[in-house]
Each structure stands twice: as structure tokens, then as C-alpha cells.
């Protein structure tokens, strides 16, 4: 079952600021995630139903939450991994 994609409005602003190559790389991974969103290796501890997509070469991370009741993959935060900012922003946004 394919999931739908939705963005937190702050995450959408972050998405729009990304360079085109980074955005294209994340798009490819998001297409895979929409088919099978619960990837255990990418599960985030301490954040219920949250997972990450990581681009190792550029250091970018995308944090998303799977909402089964609505069949939605909800993007919470997008950004560089530096000082774990992308993760701390995600925690603030889901609480």
C-alpha cells in the first residue's frame, strides 16, 4: 500500500531552501519510503513512529513520521546533521 506525502509547513520551507541536487536525491529516497515507510534501520529512538532518510555524501537528513490511520508519511524536519539540529527541531515539532 502506498502512503501519501505531507509536510509540516516549517519543513516545507526547509525543503524549498535545499539545492536542486540534494532535493532530487531526497525525492528518490522518498518515493521508496512511500511504498514501505517503516524501515527498522532508520527508526529514531525516543520519537514514536519517526524515521530518517540520510544522505551521507552531503550530510543532509530528513525526519518523517508514519501516520498509519491517515496512510501518510509526514515530513517533520529537513536539514544538515551538524550538531544534531535536524533531530532536535523534529523533537520540538512533534511535541
From Swiss-Prot:
Q: Name one GO cellular component term.
A: toxin-antitoxin complex
Which residues are catalytic? 52, 81
Sorted UniProt keywords: Antibiotic resistance, Endonuclease, Hydrolase, Nuclease, Repressor, RNA-binding, rRNA-binding, Stress response, Toxin-antitoxin system, Transcription, Transcription regulation
Q: Which GO terms describe its molecular function?
A: DNA-binding transcription repressor activity; endonuclease activity; ribosome binding; RNA endonuclease activity; rRNA binding; toxin sequestering activity; transcription cis-regulatory region binding
What is reported when this gene is inactivated? Cells missing relBE have a higher steady-state level of translation during amino acid starvation than wild-type cells. They survive antibiotic treatment in log phase better than wild-type cells. Cells missing mazE-mazF survive hydroxyurea treatment better than wild-type; further disruption of relE-relB and tonB yields even better survival.
The reply to whether tRNA processing figures as a keyword in the UniProt entry is no
**Induction conditions:** By amino acid starvation, by glucose starvation and by chloramphenicol; induction is independent of ppGpp. Autorepressed by RelB, RelE acts as a corepressor. Member of the relBEF operon. Operon induced by ectopic expression of toxins HicA, HipA, MazF, MqsR and itself, but not by YafQ.
Q: Name one Pfam family in it.
A: ParE_toxin
Q: Give the EC number(s) listed in the UniProt record.
A: 3.1.-.-
GO BP field? cellular response to amino acid starvation; mRNA catabolic process; negative regulation of translation; regulation of DNA-templated transcription; regulation of growth; response to antibiotic; single-species biofilm formation
Q: Where is this site: Transition state stabilizer?
A: 54, 61
**Hey, which family's this protein in?**
Belongs to the RelE toxin family.
NCBIfam families in alphabetical order: RelE_StbE (TIGR02385)
Give the miscellaneous note.
Answer: There are estimated to be 550-1100 RelB and 50-100 RelE molecules in rapidly growing cells of MG1655; as they have quite high affinity for each other (dissociation constant of 0.33 nM) there is probably less than 1 free RelE molecule per cell. The RelB(2)-RelE complex has a half-life of over 70 minutes.
Q: How does it assemble?
A: Forms an RelB(2)-RelE(2) heterotetramer. Also forms an RelB(2)-RelE heterotrimer. The RelB(2)-RelE complex is probably the one that binds DNA and represses transcription, possibly as 2 heterotrimers, 1 bound to each of 2 operators. RelE occupies the A site of the 70S ribosome, making extensive contacts with the 16S rRNA. Its presence blocks access of tRNAs and translation factors. RelB bound to RelE prevents RelE from entering the ribosomal A site and thus inhibits its endonuclease activity.
Q: What does this protein do?
A: Toxic component of a type II toxin-antitoxin (TA) system. A sequence-specific, ribosome-dependent mRNA endoribonuclease that inhibits translation during amino acid starvation (the stringent response). In vitro acts by cleaving mRNA with high codon specificity in the ribosomal A site between positions 2 and 3. The stop codon UAG is cleaved at a fast rate while UAA and UGA are cleaved with intermediate and slow rates. In vitro mRNA cleavage can also occur in the ribosomal E site after peptide release from peptidyl-tRNA in the P site as well as on free 30S subunits. Seems to be a principal mediator of cell death in liquid media. Implicated in hydroxy radical-mediated cell death induced by hydroxyurea treatment.
**Protein name in the entry:** mRNA interferase toxin RelE
Question: What does UniProt list as this organism's lineage?
Answer: Bacteria, Pseudomonadati, Pseudomonadota, Gammaproteobacteria, Enterobacterales
Amino acid at each position: 500500500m502506498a502512503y501519501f506525502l505531507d509536510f509540516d509547513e516549517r519543513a516545507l520551507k526547509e525543503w524549498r531552501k535545499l539545492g536542486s541536487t540534494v532535493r532530487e536525491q531526497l525525492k528518490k529516497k522518498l518515493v521508496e519510503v512511500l511504498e514501505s515507510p517503516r524501515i527498522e534501520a532508520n527508526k529514531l529512538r525516543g520519537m514514536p513512529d519517526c524515521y530518517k532518510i540520510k544522505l551521507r555524501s552531503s550530510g543532509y537528513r530528513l525526519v518523517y513520521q508514519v501516520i498509519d490511520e491517515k496512510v501518510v508519511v509526514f515530513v517533520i524536519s529537513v536539514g544538515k546533521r551538524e550538531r544534531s539540529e535536524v533531530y532536535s527541531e523534529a523533537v520540538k515539532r512533534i511535541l
